[in-house]
């Protein structure tokens, strides 16, 4: 029997409203490690523009991005029975993302987040509704699953997913822990960590998972591998990214920006999309590292997490034009 989907993404979906601020300030301490966005209190604050983007979120962005790269994708998520939920379904239809695992929750609104853009960075106001989801058992057999952000109410779903993975040993798993999943940590999500084929985190998230102050990349890789993931990708913002398959560590520089980034929302998801899609296509780890930053570069040139996502011909064309220095380096 021919497999219907190459990859099924699992996680919350939202509408993002991007508000571009002009009259704000940023206050930082400890060498710009901790920064605060400041607005005038009890005042009318002007903004430059508003852009509304439906069907976004870590898993949604990956499902859309992988579909643009030519893979057959679907998403298991939940929405409200309202106008915004219908917008999300239409966006998935347009992007050729399978919708049969989208649970419509009557009586609840669709997740709606506000993204405050100032310069090239963003601060996001979030709220996850307490949705009911279709159980993972509904997925039957999937060759790849990508699992990411869900709200605090969804702990039971994590246990259901662990049960599904026990019954489907051949299913490969991409895991990018969201805010609540980082809070739960490997102690409560140990079975998911142990079944993870490829894990995506940034350097700070890796430190948080391991409860360490060390930022040494090899120390972080060793600690995360002990939790179970076979391949790990650690992003480090504009500095580049790292990856490990337990046998070898690599550093990958960023793809050169054609112009200064416009807005960074979705850069990490675009990286995960390029990386994971290459693996689903059967490409080696070193090639996955080349695919990932190209997608991130394209996304930060646009507002929102999806507008800049590349098609496969576009990505391969950019790779052919890449400088000779754009390749993984063993570390």
What is each PLM-predicted segment?
Residues 95, 278, 295, 299:
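Short alpha-helical functional segments enriched in proximate histidine and acidic residues
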Residues 110-113:
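Short alpha-helix plus adjacent loop in nuclease-associated cores
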Residues 71, 207-208, 261-285, 289, ...:
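Short, small-residue alpha-helix embedded
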Residues 45-54, 253-266, 286:
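Short pre-catalytic strand/loop immediately N-terminal to key active-site residues, enriched for Gly-Thr
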Residues 298-307:
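Short arginine-rich
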Residues 1-29, 51, 89-104, 116-255, ...:
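Ribokinase/PfkB-type carbohydrate-kinase core domain
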Residues 72-100:
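A glycine-rich beta-to-alpha transition motif near the start of alpha/beta enzyme domains, typified by
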Residues 1-74, 86:
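Glycine-rich phosphate/adenosyl-contacting loop at the front of the ribokinase-like
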């Amino acid at each position: 029997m021919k497999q219907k989907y190459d990859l099924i993404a699992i996680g919350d979906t939202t509408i993002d409203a991007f508000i571009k601020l002009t009259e704000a300030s940023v206050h930082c301490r400890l060498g710009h490690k901790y920064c605060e966005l400041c607005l005038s209190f009890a005042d009318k604050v002007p903004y430059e523009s508003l852009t509304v983007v439906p069907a976004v979120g870590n898993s949604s962005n990956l499902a859309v991005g992988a579909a643009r790269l030519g893979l057959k994708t679907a998403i298991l998520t939940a929405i409200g029975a309202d106008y915004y939920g219908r917008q999300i379904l239409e966006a998935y239809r347009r992007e050729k993302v399978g919708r049969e695992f989208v649970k419509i929750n009557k009586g609840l609104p669709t997740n709606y987040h506000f993204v405050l853009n100032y310069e090239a960075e963003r601060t996001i106001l979030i709220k996850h509704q307490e949705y009911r989801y279709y159980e993972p058992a509904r997925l039957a057999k999937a060759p790849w699953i990508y699992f990411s952000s869900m709200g605090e109410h969804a702990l039971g779903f994590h246990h259901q997913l662990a049960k599904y993975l026990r019954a489907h040993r051949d299913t490969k798993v991409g895991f990018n822990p969201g805010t609540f999943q980082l809070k739960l940590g490997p102690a409560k999500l140990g079975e998911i960590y142990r079944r993870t084929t490829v894990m995506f985190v940034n350097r700070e998230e890796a430190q948080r998972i391991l409860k360490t102050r060390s930022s040494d990349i090899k120390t972080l890789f060793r600690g995360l591998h002990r939790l179970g993931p076979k391949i790990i990708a650690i992003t480090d913002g504009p500095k580049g990214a790292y990856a490990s398959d337990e046998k070898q560590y690599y550093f990958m520089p960023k793809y050169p920006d054609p112009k200064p980034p416009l807005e960074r929302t979705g850069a990490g998801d675009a990286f995960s999309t390029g990386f994971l899609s290459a693996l689903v296509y059967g490409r080696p780890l070193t090639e996955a590292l080349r695919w990932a930053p190209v997608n991130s570069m394209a996304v930060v040139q646009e507002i929102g997490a999806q507008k800049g996502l590349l098609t496969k011909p576009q990505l391969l064309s950019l790779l052919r034009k890449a400088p000779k220095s754009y390749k993984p380096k063993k570390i």
